[in-house]
Amino acid sequence: MNTIAPDHYKTESGLQVWDVTRYMSGNMAQAFQYVYRAGRKGNEAEDLRKAVAFLEDWVAHPDVPRAVLPEGIEPTDGPSVGGCLLLDIPDGSQWKVQPLMQIISADSYEGEAMNGQPFCGRRLITNETLPRLKKRIAELGGVDG
């Protein structure tokens, strides 16, 4: 283990969480990291509660800028690296894949959803991601749910 890049943030193929989060906004990067490491270090429910707090703060502050990508970095770069990172998630943690992809999408995409309606990342997080994480916390014996 390297203290700068601990094992609970790495995959067996060598990808690290920061390969996905480096261009994300602060709250969303923190939420992604806590969901990713949940069950890999310490108390899973506690990590998920921290992720929920960061997501709720992000939803509550629409005035804060979303991910800002430097010139030459495409919006699809983070999600494609994210997809590769998520391929390495072990079978017992597959429940994480959808919330992690939703966090990436909500932070990095603006435009239309597949149904032609405007895409709203905050609605996605509020209606799908947060309930899913709170349900998982409740399943672990936490109080959320």
Question: What is the role of each PLM region?
Answer:
Residues M1-G145:
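Intrinsically disordered, low-complexity regulatory regions
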